Structures are given as C-alpha cells and as structure tokens.
Amino acid sequence: MDELCKEYNKEHPDINFHTNYDSSGTLMTQIKEGAKCNIFFSAGVEQMDELEKGYDGGSVEKDNRKDLLNNQVCLVTWKGSNTKVKSFKDMSKAKNMALADETVPVGQYTRKALINSGLVSGDKEKADDLKDTDISKVLGGLEINSCANVGAVAAAVAGGADEIGTVYYSDTFGYEDNLEIIEKLPNSLTGDVIYPVAPLKSDDISDAEFNASNEFIKFMSEEKAVKLFEKYHFSMS
C-alpha cells in the first residue's frame, strides 16, 4: 500500500495518506469504536459485511464498495526445516504450527479448509468457532501457537519458531529466502479469498474527503495499481 500511495501522489501531491496496518478484525473494531477512517481495505468479506450493517456514527458506502483483489492461502514452512509435512492433510506430522486466531481472515479461511478437507468435523458456516484446542486435538496433539495477524504467522515460521503455518500467497513476498510453500490451498477448501475496499461515511468525514476516497479507490483498479498488486502476488477480482 505504501508504494501505491506514493504512485498516486505523483499525480495528486495534495493528498495526504495516513495508513494503519493490522488484521481486518482489529481494524474493524477500531472503526466501530470511533477511529476515524476514510477507506477500509479488508482482507476478508466478513469484516466489511459487518461494517456495512452500520455502526455508531458511521457506515460503509456500499454502492461504492468493490471486491478488488483475490489472494490464496498457502501452507508454509521455513527453508531447511526438513519437515515431513508434504500437504495440508499431513499437518499432524509437524511439531508445531503458527495459526492466526479466529478473528483474523487468514485464520478463518484456514479453519474453513480444515472442515472442508475433512480433517475437522463441523459446520463450515461456524468455522470461526473452531478453537485452537479443537484443532490440536484432531491433529494428534499438534502444538498450535496463536498469532494476532498473518504477519506474525509469517515471521514465526520464517524465523523457525514454528514448523508450519498458513499465510496468504502475497505474504510470501520478501520471504523467498526464508519460507518454502508446501501447498497453495484451493478455493474449494478455503472459499474465495476476496479483498473488498469501500469508502466510509461519518459525521467527521467531509464531502471533499469522501470524494477523494472514491477517486483513490478508482485508481486502485487502474493499470499502474494493477501492476503493483500483481508484483506482490495478488490477482484482480
């Protein structure tokens, strides 16, 4: 996003960006609790849907909401780990796993994959209720180390603290020397991994700010932006 903002500023130097990066669940909570935000760019549809219901003092402008990007969940290990895990269904062969918690989109997608693959029994619509203890039990006592966001998962596995973990394909960018992809999970297991974006409206957001937000969102689908997204392993939705 920093590169994208810099590219946009080349033609719009009057626009000032103040970016806040965290898990989509954390960002959603911050917005609902009153943090000012002009644009919400989420790694999960569920968090955007929740804000679209409305919150105290603001709302998602749903007519301008756009499903912008696609991603893919990957099972990874650290390079040189000599893990016995060769696929998602082999995860019980690992000693430990870094897993984003159930409020984080990549953690939610992973839990859906566990159910859809038959590794864990349950209702895929209630995948978010699947706790680490449940996962550990069905995977033969695999040690699950909960992470607050996908970046923490990538760092834990790349640093060798955990043998395996699930991250987005985009999160492997920059870790080529440290991470090895064991398997890219098919969407039939995870569901579509969609990144929606939308402008927000609230009492403290001016019409000028709202219009500027819409212009930037339009730019996010233009050729210069597409090339940047593809560089980081995203595809356009």
Feature annotation, model-predicted:
Residues 1-12, 16, 25, 45, ...:
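Exported/periplasmic ABC-transporter solute-binding proteins
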Residues 55-66:
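Central helical "cap/lid" subdomain
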Residues 31, 65-68:
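Short, glycine-/small- and polar/acidic-enriched structural segments
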Residues 19-29, 36-52:
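Ligand-binding clamshell of periplasmic/extracellular solute-binding protein-like
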Residues 30-31, 156:
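CheY-like receiver
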